[in-house]
Design a protein with these regions (language model features):
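Sequence/structural signature of beta-propeller domains
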Residues: 2-339
Length: 339
């Protein structure tokens, strides 16, 4: 049954406390790692989830885990990047970074190892440390997108971010919704950067994004979304195309979707990308789902694989999921498909 139908069955008197609970989950101050603490090893348990081998669109699920830890700073993961040595580097809502090594056995994700965590921000105000996306630049830097106080932190080195070298601001992002700003960030091979707002939209429904060309000029462009969903992370697929992760979470159910975005029109000077929805899944799918927020492409054995992670909002009713997807078929190209 759809969430809308479920809400229609709830007596109106119960909707007010329910809505307040959902809002509180979104804005409450989360637990966070002590920014003054040294980088530390974190004990994480990984529970295998069903669905191995299940196909959706061009993807095959090759392992899914539910991750948990007694460390109070673990959780709230919002962005994910693949490192050249096979490790994954993530950032979260509480100003923390998390690094781990996926354990792949017989072609499936079987566990995680070498888990470490630390703080990329010494701030104590959530608005000043709300990490949403992370990318590693070919030039040897690490970029983290923050929302609420919309900006991009630039760190020297491709690894755990500790002290930002500089901060990038974009005046056009000042009008983005406080809790719906720069949710997805991508760097193209030529050095161009795409920064996508979660909630700011144009009149045609496309999500507002800022496209910074390699020469440093920045223009506002539109990225088509998936109806009812919000974009949460982006990862470059090949030159001119990227994969975009979307989530739907309303406190009652979670759904997720992946689209492919063709930026060729924007690169050529246009103001709107073409997009096609590849997959969407929910609780009735064979794939596990929660509040999916992080996604990255990694190279394993010379082949691209996709890793997805969910943000549990430091809420015991939610889970931190790590999914590994294989490309079992070519990613389709073509004109935009209505969303």
């Amino acid at each position: 049954m759809r969430a809308k139908t479920l809400w229609n069955l709830v007596p109106p008197v119960l909707l007010i406390p329910a809505a307040a609970w959902i809002l509180w989950q979104e804005v409450r101050p989360p637990s966070r790692p002590d920014a003054s603490a040294r980088d530390r090893t974190v004990a994480v348990t990984a529970t295998a989830l069903p669905g191995d081998g299940a196909m959706l669109g061009p993807f095959r699920l090759a392992g899914a885990l539910a991750l948990a830890s007694s460390d109070t700073g673990f959780g709230g993961i919002s962005g994910l990047a693949a490192m050249s040595d096979g490790r994954l580097l993530a950032v979260g809502d509480a100003g923390q970074w998390l690094m781990l090594r996926p354990v792949v056995q017989a072609g499936r994700l079987a566990g995680v190892a070498d888990v470490r965590m630390g703080a990329f921000s010494a701030a104590t105000d959530k608005a000043a440390m709300d990490g949403e996306a992370i990318v590693l630049s070919p030039g040897g830097r690490t970029l983290i997108s923050l929302e609420q106080q919309h900006r991009i932190l630039v760190f020297d080195g491709r690894g755990p971010p500790r002290k930002p070298a500089r901060t990038m601001f974009r005046t056009a992002a000042a009008g983005w919704p406080p809790n719906g700003g720069g949710e997805a960030l991508a760097l193209l091979p030529d050095g161009a950067m795409l920064w996508i707002s979660e909630q700011a939209r144009r009149r045609d429904g496309a999500h507002v994004a800022l496209f910074t060309r390699a020469d440093g000029t920045t223009v506002s462009v539109g990225i088509p979304g998936v109806a009812g969903f919000s974009p949460t992370d982006a990862t470059v697929l090949d030159n001119g195309r990227l994969l975009l992760l979307h989530r739907l979470y309303n406190g009652v159910e979670s759904q997720a979707a992946i689209s492919v975005v063709d930026l060729s029109a924007i690169v050529a000077g246009g103001d709107t990308a073409a997009a096609r929805t590849l997959v969407r899944w929910g609780r009735r799918s064979q794939w596990p789902v929660d509040n999916m927020e992080g996604m990255t492409v990694a190279q394993e054995g010379g082949k691209p694989v996709l890793y997805l992670v969910s943000d549990d909002n430091f809420n015991p009713a939610q889970r931190t999921l790590l999914l590994r997807l294989e490309l079992a078929a070519p990613i389709p190209s073509g004109p935009a498909v209505p969303h």
